[in-house]
Amino acid sequence: MREKLPRDVGELLHSHAQEYFFGSTAPDLFYYDVPTPFDATPSSEIISETLHGRMGNKNNEHIFWMLDRMKKLDQQDRYFAFIAGYLSHIAADTIFHPMVYSRTGNYFDQDPAERKRSRARHRVLETSLDLYLLSKSGRTLRGLGLLGLLKVPEDF
């Protein structure tokens, strides 16, 4: 994909690949704060639901906030890579969600038990797709080194 980007952007994303990959997973991070996909905790789940706009909120406001905030920070290239990854997640969700929903059931089912099962299947399928694409790129989850990026600067 890097070859299809303007050269300076491709080089920036290559230089800050960890930040890019971290951004590409960030919208779903709070979904993973669960013992199993079947036991999502409401407090963590609501954060990702809000980031995805499922609460009826505008799901792009925080992106504009991040872009505005980035202008005031040191190491703008690292934050740009993170935001580019974040936007790639949104693009992938836009493309893949119709298929994921059709395979996993009604995410908003009126029956709480079926809704819980559908959401668990949704997360398992998305995680499987993530891991498949990661393996196709020749990378491993451990090799991304994302945990080293969890230090948030004080000025953020």
Regions found by a protein language model. Give the residues of each.
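Short, intrinsically disordered, charge-balanced linker/junction segments flanking boundaries
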Residues: E3, G85, V152-F156
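N-terminal, motif-rich segments that launch catalysis or mediate targeting to/interaction with membranes
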Residues: M1-A81, T94, M99-G148
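Active-site His/Glu-centered metal-binding helix of metallohydrolases
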Residues: L87, A91-I95
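Short, glycine/charge-rich beta-strand/loop segments that flank catalytic centers
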Residues: F80-S88
